Amino acid sequence: MLKDIVLVLALQLVYVPILTLRTIFMVKNMSLLAAFMGFLEALIYVFGLSIVFSGKQSYIVMIVYAAGFGARGFLLEDISSKSWAIGYTTVTVNLQQKNQELIHLLRESGYGVTVYTGEGRDSQRYRLDILTKRNREEELLELIERYEPKAFIISYEPRRFKGGFLVASMKKRVKRKKECHES
């Protein structure tokens, strides 16, 4: 019976990351991967329930199943969704002054930055459009906050993009920067 309890708990803890990935893949229109994750999700679900409903002392296993269901969300869901940040984010930063130091640092850190000059209500404003991988968004926001604490920032997920400064260039630039600092 202890083996069943441990197995049910383990199945529940594996179930959440698969459910999270399936949802992410569905939202990103990655149908084949979403379908595969759905298959795994159903397999784990049916297997777990079959263990719960078999045996003489299934009420204990049912409680563990329910507890595992609650614990998995508490322990894993937030962690898995942040660490698997799939895709890209566009961050728009509005500044009162053109901060060349920030712009240079962002580019040296591997971010694609486009700078626009615009007319605000009272004065000229500067807008930075920055494309980054979702898993680097927090790092980017911290960097901006450090250099421009009063910046107005909007981030959103682009549905589609073509051309421009993409990840290959970002990776090359970061790699070159690391090589320069190591030598």
Swiss-Prot record:
Keywords: Cell membrane, Membrane, Transmembrane, Transmembrane helix. Signal peptide: none annotated. The chain crosses the membrane at residues 5-25, 33-53, 59-79. The keyword Cell membrane applies. It comes from the Bacteria. It is a multi-pass membrane protein. This is UPF0316 protein GTNG_0803. Its main location: membrane. Pfam families: DUF2179 (PF10035), DUF5698 (PF18955). It is found in: Cell membrane. Belongs to the UPF0316 family. InterPro entries: DUF2179, DUF5698, UPF0316. It comes from Geobacillus thermodenitrificans (strain NG80-2). One of its GO terms (cellular component) is plasma membrane.
